[in-house]
């Protein structure tokens, strides 16, 4: 027969995108069909017409009797069977190549969007859409293609068509030949003058090969049915698993992420904290009574108290004249208070500081005590 290398290379690529049952089916196809057909079976049927003899001298009688007994050669019939049962697998391979081509386009587009993202362009929605498309096509990391969606449907359809072709060819073979060969065939057909007997060479050997190919066809059909049930139950299992842990819940393509890592501090001004009512370092049993954070008087108090605190601190440092004892900027901590209309303005320019986590229990200095005891015209009455 002809060269099977082209078909073999194509079918070999399917193994990377098939299930375990599909790989076994391909092994059976390669070893017990293509290899056996190209070596032993072809030599056994090589002289089928030349060794076909009839007990008549009438010209043309042997030809018409051979045509009646064997409308198509067994070898050519099995070649057609292999081609037909391989076509659905090749169509599935074409779908895999289509998905891989889609993957290349999506990866290229994703790289372009990431380059635009580095320039400050907001492309988060487009990147999420690309992730959804990859999931839809069954594309995973490192170029791996998972059987999902349209690819899974194509695979199931290919299994169904392979099974149908196997059954159809078995029925056709049984209708034309049966599953055994006789040593003598009786023929009565023009131009034969009368009923003649025709003799077949090596009928027992050919019958053994026919039975062997029949068993291989039945094994392939059984593998197709088993694989069909396996893919069906695996799809149901993945669907149930997907409902319990859906894709959008794990990736969240359109839902904004929540920032749960913000620090929580206590505010000792009678107003509520923007993040938490109590400091994580507060002693056990400690409770802080806070006011309503939406209260306008509370917000005004926050701003005025912050300005007054910094004014008192600057005046105290100026009176002391001790530049070496000035607290470094890394240890200074302003107060941060919520504002529903807009973010709180920075009080000290160039210093982005954090709110106090705990109350400083150190005693006040003597200069600070004298400075704080003097009344100032701009002091707040609290």
UniProtKB/Swiss-Prot annotation:
One of its GO terms (cellular component) is fascia adherens. It is a multi-pass membrane protein. Residues 264-382 are annotated as: Interaction with UBQLN4. Residues 244-382 are annotated as: Interaction with NOV. GO terms for molecular function: beta-tubulin binding; channel activity; efflux transmembrane transporter activity; gap junction channel activity; gap junction channel activity involved in cardiac conduction electrical coupling; gap junction hemi-channel activity; glutathione transmembrane transporter activity; protein tyrosine kinase binding. The modification Phosphoserine is found at residues 5, 255, 257, 262, 306, 314, 325, 328, 330, 341, 365, 368-369, 373. Phosphorylation at Ser-325, Ser-328 and Ser-330 by CK1 modulates gap junction assembly. Phosphorylated at Ser-368 by PRKCG; phosphorylation induces disassembly of gap junction plaques and inhibition of gap junction activity. Phosphorylation at Ser-368 by PRKCD triggers its internalization into small vesicles leading to proteasome-mediated degradation. Sumoylated with SUMO1, SUMO2 and SUMO3, which may regulate the level of functional Cx43 gap junctions at the plasma membrane. May be desumoylated by SENP1 or SENP2. It is found in: Cell membrane; Cell junction, Gap junction; Endoplasmic reticulum. The modification S-nitrosocysteine is found at residue 271. There is a cross-link at residues 144, 237 (Glycyl lysine isopeptide (Lys-Gly) (interchain with G-Cter in SUMO)). It comes from the Eukaryota. Residues 362-374 have a biased composition (Low complexity). GO terms for biological process: adult heart development; atrial ventricular junction remodeling; blood vessel morphogenesis; bone development; bone remodeling; cardiac conduction; cell communication by chemical coupling; cell communication by electrical coupling. The modification Phosphothreonine is found at residues 275, 326. Induction: In bladder smooth muscle cells, exhibits night/day variations with low levels during the sleep phase, at circadian time (CT) 4-12 (at protein level). Down-regulation during the night allows increase in bladder capacity, avoiding disturbance of sleep by micturition. Expression starts to increase around CT12 and forms a plateau during the active phase (CT16-24) (at protein level). Circadian transcription is activated by NR1D1. Up-regulated by SP1 and SP3. A connexon is composed of a hexamer of connexins. Interacts with CSNK1D. Interacts with RIC1/CIP150. Interacts (via C-terminus) with TJP1. Interacts (via C-terminus) with SRC (via SH3 domain). Interacts (not ubiquitinated) with UBQLN4 (via UBA domain). Interacts with CNST. Interacts with SGSM3. Interacts with NOV. Interacts with TMEM65. Interacts with ANK3/ANKG and PKP2. Gap junction protein that acts as a regulator of bladder capacity. A gap junction consists of a cluster of closely packed pairs of transmembrane channels, the connexons, through which materials of low MW diffuse from one cell to a neighboring cell. Negative regulator of bladder functional capacity: acts by enhancing intercellular electrical and chemical transmission, thus sensitizing bladder muscles to cholinergic neural stimuli and causing them to contract. May play a role in cell growth inhibition through the regulation of NOV expression and localization. Connexin 43 is possibly the ATP-induced pore of mouse macrophages. Belongs to the connexin family. Alpha-type (group II) subfamily. This is Gap junction alpha-1 protein. It comes from Mus musculus (Mouse).
């Amino acid at each position: 027969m002809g060269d099977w290398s082209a078909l073999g290379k194509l079918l070999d690529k399917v193994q990377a995108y098939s299930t375990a049952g599909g790989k076994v089916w391909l092994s059976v196809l390669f070893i017990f069909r293509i290899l056996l057909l190209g070596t032993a079976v072809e030599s056994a049927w090589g002289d089928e017409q030349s060794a076909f003899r009839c007990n008549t001298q009438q010209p043309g009688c042997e030809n018409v009797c051979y045509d009646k007994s064997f409308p198509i050669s067994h070898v050519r019939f099995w070649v057609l069977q292999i081609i037909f049962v391989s076509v659905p697998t090749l169509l599935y391979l074409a779908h895999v190549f289509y998905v891989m081509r889609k993957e290349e386009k999506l990866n290229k587009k994703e790289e372009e969007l990431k380059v635009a993202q580095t320039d400050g362009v907001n492309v988060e929605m487009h990147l999420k859409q690309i992730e959804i498309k990859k999931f839809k096509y069954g594309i995973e990391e490192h170029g791996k293609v998972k059987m999902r969606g349209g690819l899974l449907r194509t695979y199931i359809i290919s299994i169904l068509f392979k099974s149908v072709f196997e059954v159809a060819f078995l029925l056709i073979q049984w209708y034309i030949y049966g599953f055994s060969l006789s040593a003598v065939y009786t023929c009565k057909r023009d131009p034969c003058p009368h009923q003649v007997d025709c003799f077949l060479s090596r009928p027992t050997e050919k019958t053994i090969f026919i039975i062997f190919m029949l068993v291989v066809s039945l094994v392939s059909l059984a593998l197709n049915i088993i694989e069909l049930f396996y893919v069906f139950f695996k799809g149901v299992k993945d669907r149930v698993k997907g409902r319990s842990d859906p894709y959008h819940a794990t990736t969240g393509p359109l839902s904004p992420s929540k920032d749960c890592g913000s620090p929580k501090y206590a505010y000792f001004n009678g107003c509520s904290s923007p993040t938490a009512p109590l400091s994580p370092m507060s002693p056990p049993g400690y409770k802080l009574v806070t006011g309503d954070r939406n209260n306008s008087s509370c917000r005004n108090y926050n701003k005025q108290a912050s300005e007054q605190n910094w004014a008192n601190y600057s005046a105290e440092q100026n009176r002391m004249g001790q530049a070496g004892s000035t607290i470094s900027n890394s240890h200074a901590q302003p107060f941060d208070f919520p504002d529903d209309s807009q973010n709180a303005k920075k009080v000290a320019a160039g210093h982005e500081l954090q709110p106090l986590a705990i109350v400083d229990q150190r005693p006040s200095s003597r200069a600070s005590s004298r400075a704080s005891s003097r009344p100032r015209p701009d002091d707040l009455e609290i």
